[in-house]
From Swiss-Prot:
The gene is atpF2. The chain crosses the membrane at residues 23-43. F-type ATPases have 2 components, F(1) - the catalytic core - and F(0) - the membrane proton channel. F(1) has five subunits: alpha(3), beta(3), gamma(1), delta(1), epsilon(1). F(0) has four main subunits: a(1), b(1), b'(1) and c(10-14). The alpha and beta chains form an alternating ring which encloses part of the gamma chain. F(1) is attached to F(0) by a central stalk formed by the gamma and epsilon chains, while a peripheral stalk is formed by the delta, b and b' chains. It is found in: Cellular thylakoid membrane. GO terms for molecular function: proton-transporting ATP synthase activity, rotational mechanism; proton-transporting ATPase activity, rotational mechanism. This is ATP synthase subunit b'.
Length: 155
């Protein structure tokens, strides 16, 4: 091990740590070349991919906002249509109820008038039968009274 330390000391130039030889500019050139190579081979494709993803995300967000706005607009339209349909159905139901009520009243009026006419006809028939019965009773009463008078006079 001792020989390695001697070897390391022997390789060190006389200027020390800040000795200006060709190593420092060579390293600077290597860093610049490596930067250009990495820029061409790695940073540009990665940057392009990142930009593409950002573009995709921004277009996706814009499309999502448009779809959300469209969905909200459609929801508002459908709510308005539903409200209109409910109003129309209420109007139709009220109209139907009024029509049923009108038809019921008409049918009731017709039935009452028919019942009144049947009742009047029956009353007329009853009165005619009553008059006929009274006339029949009167004639029978006259016959009976004349028969009684004849028997009383004959007796």
């Amino acid at each position: 091990m001792h020989s390695w330390l001697l070897l390391a000391e022997a390789a060190t130039p006389k200027g020390g740590l800040f000795d200006l030889d060709a190593t420092l500019p060579l390293m600077a050139v290597q860093v610049v070349v490596l930067t250009f190579v990495l820029n061409a081979l790695f940073f540009r494709p990665v940057g392009k991919t990142v930009e593409d993803r950002e573009g995709y995300i921004s277009t996706s967000r814009a499309q999502a906002k448009e779809k959300l706005a469209q969905a909200e607009r459609l929801e508002a339209e459908l709510k308005a249509q539903l409200l209109d349909a409910r109003k129309q159905s209420v109007a139709v139901i009220q109209k139907a109820e009024e029509e049923v009520d009108r038809l019921f009243r008409e049918a009731l009026a017709v039935a009452q008038s028919e019942a009144n006419s049947v009742r009047e006809k029956a009353r007329g028939e009853v009165d005619a039968e009553k008059a006929k019965a009274f006339s029949g009773i009167d004639s029978q009463a006259e016959k009976l009274s004349s028969l009684i008078v004849d028997r009383l006079l004959a007796a």
